[in-house]
């Protein structure tokens, strides 16, 4: 009887409550983040202690809207969840990690509470390539009749034929035009000239290689023969203020350049009235206006391509920035300079014979920055791209990037090239290049070299030149109608 009483007096064992589970301290990105881009996302969770997520539990981690959980990993106090198969559709996705999935390492410890993490993807409309449908008029409402004639002709030829073109070797001669004729029996439809030697015009007697821009016999000859005239401007500026001070009296300073690594000239200062840099560019613009006026007086329209290649290399080749001083300090000053140049030449100096061509760089990846640098539809008539590549492909990537830039509102052209894009390939691809302009090369004696050894040019063999010039998809000077009326 006593033993029975003793057994009934025993106390039940004590059951301890589990210790609180791991607590979530932070989440990256934060819960509720919007504008997520890409097809994958890594969510990083930080807890207040070391945690684990056994393989058997990882299958319980889910995400909705068709996305998938690719991987879950726990290490020390951090858990990462890799989410895949996301779409930039504007939808909100929710990641769920049920209670019991993540736990600590202590005995008699509860698991972490359920975690719900939501994020919203950026809405990106599906890419639809733009079709070329250029506007029917020039940006200058007072454009000369001859300029209108040229533009209307380019519109008519778009998608039918590409005009042949070459850049002269000495900036103001027809030597390359004549060399192509001598070799193929046809003259290029478009001849390119350059205000490269502006600071040395008129030509000093002892500098035979410098051009006299008052002598417009070369463009007059080209226009009179039915060809078109293109001018660009490798805009030389003083290397330093000292060079400007030393040369300002005779305007023939020795220290000049257009490459960024050769001049400290600052476009931002040039846009400020009252600075010596502004004084310089305004004098240059005035001088160029005078030379263009000579052409307008002769009824010669000018396909005008200043500030070419916009930003140069768009920093895609490294930290050195743009090639040319007009792109060194970013998009905004460059756009301002373009608009200033347009305003001065058109509105101040009253030049109505210009067709404005804005040029981009061909570098892959630069397409995403074109719009940042574009001065606006109201300042540009035609879009160009300078292409130096080791093939004769149709250049579809570059073509579509230009067309997309203005949703097809502007004609597009290969404004410079080495190896000529094959006209047949271009037509087969539906690439409606308005013209191509082959850059000039010459030997040490100044003779034109049609097939340089450089890989970007050497496919322009003797036979290929003849093939291109005789192509049914190419228009040469001999094929041009009279546009001088």
Where are the regions that the model predicts?
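Short, surface-exposed alpha-helix to beta-strand junction/turn motifs within ectodomains of secreted
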Residues: 39-72, 100-103
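C-terminal motif of bacterial Sec signal peptides marking the signal peptidase cleavage site
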Residues: 4-7
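Aromatic-lined carbohydrate-recognition surfaces of secreted/lumenal glycan-active proteins
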Residues: 166-167, 305-307, 338-368, 410-419
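Acidic, Ser/Thr/Gly/Pro-rich low-complexity segments and short DxT(G/T)-type signature motifs
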Residues: 13-33, 99-126
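N-terminal module-boundary/linker segments of secreted carbohydrate-active enzymes
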Residues: 123-196, 200-212, 424-425, 479-485
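Aromatic- and acid-rich polysaccharide-binding/catalytic face
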Residues: 193, 370-392, 439
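Substrate-binding cleft of extracellular glycoside hydrolase catalytic domains
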Residues: 201, 205-342, 347, 351
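Substrate-binding cleft of secreted/luminal carbohydrate-active enzymes
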Residues: 163-168, 410-485
């Amino acid at each position: 009887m006593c033993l029975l009483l003793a057994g009934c007096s025993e106390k039940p064992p004590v059951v301890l409550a589990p210790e609180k589970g791991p607590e979530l301290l932070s989440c990256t990105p934060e819960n509720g983040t919007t504008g997520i881009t890409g097809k994958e996302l890594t969510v990083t969770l930080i807890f207040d202690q070391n945690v684990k997520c056994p393989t058997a539990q990882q299958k319980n981690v889910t995400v909705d809207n068709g996305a998938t959980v690719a991987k879950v990993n726990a290490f020390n106090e951090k858990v990462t969840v890799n989410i895949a198969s996301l779409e930039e559709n504007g939808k909100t996705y929710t990641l769920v990690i049920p209670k019991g999935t993540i736990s600590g390492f202590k005995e008699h410890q509860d698991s972490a509470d359920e975690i719900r993490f939501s994020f919203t993807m950026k809405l990106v409309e599906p890419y639809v390539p733009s079709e070329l449908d250029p506007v029917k008029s020039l940006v200058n409402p007072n454009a000369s009749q001859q300029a209108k004639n040229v533009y209307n002709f380019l519109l008519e030829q778009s998608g039918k034929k590409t005009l042949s073109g070459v850049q002269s070797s000495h900036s103001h001669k027809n030597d390359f035009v004549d060399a192509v004729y001598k070799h193929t029996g046809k003259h290029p439809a478009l001849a390119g000239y350059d205000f490269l030697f502006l600071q040395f015009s008129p030509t000093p007697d002892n500098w035979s290689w410098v051009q006299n821009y008052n002598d417009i016999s070369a463009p007059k000859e080209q226009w009179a023969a039915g060809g078109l005239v293109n001018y660009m401007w490798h805009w030389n500026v003083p290397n330093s203020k000292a060079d400007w001070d030393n040369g300002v009296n005779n305007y023939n300073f020795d220290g000049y350049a257009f490459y960024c690594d050769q001049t400290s000239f600052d476009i931002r200062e040039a846009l400020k009235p009252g600075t010596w840099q502004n004084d310089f560019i305004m004098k240059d613009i005035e001088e160029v206006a005078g030379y263009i006026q000579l052409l307008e007086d002769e009824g010669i329209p000018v396909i005008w391509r200043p500030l070419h290649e916009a930003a140069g290399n768009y920093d895609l080749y490294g930290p050195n920035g743009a090639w040319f001083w007009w792109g060194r300090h970013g998009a905004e000053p460059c756009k301002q300079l373009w608009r200033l140049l347009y305003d001065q030449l058109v509105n101040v100096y009253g030049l109505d014979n210009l067709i404005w061509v804005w040029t981009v760089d061909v570098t892959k990846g630069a397409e995403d920055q074109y719009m940042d640098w574009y001065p606006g539809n109201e300042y540009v008539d035609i879009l160009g791209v300078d292409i130096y590549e080791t093939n004769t492909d149709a250049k579809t990537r570059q073509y579509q990037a230009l067309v997309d830039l203005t949703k097809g509102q502007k004609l597009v052209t290969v404004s410079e090239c080495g190896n000529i894009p094959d006209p047949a390939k271009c037509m087969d691809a539906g690439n409606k290049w308005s013209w191509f302009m082959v850059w000039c090369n010459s030997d040490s004696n100044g003779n034109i070299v049609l097939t340089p050894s450089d890989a970007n040019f050497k496919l322009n063999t003797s036979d290929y030149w003849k093939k291109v010039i005789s192509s049914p998809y190419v228009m040469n000077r001999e094929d041009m109608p009279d546009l001088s009326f």
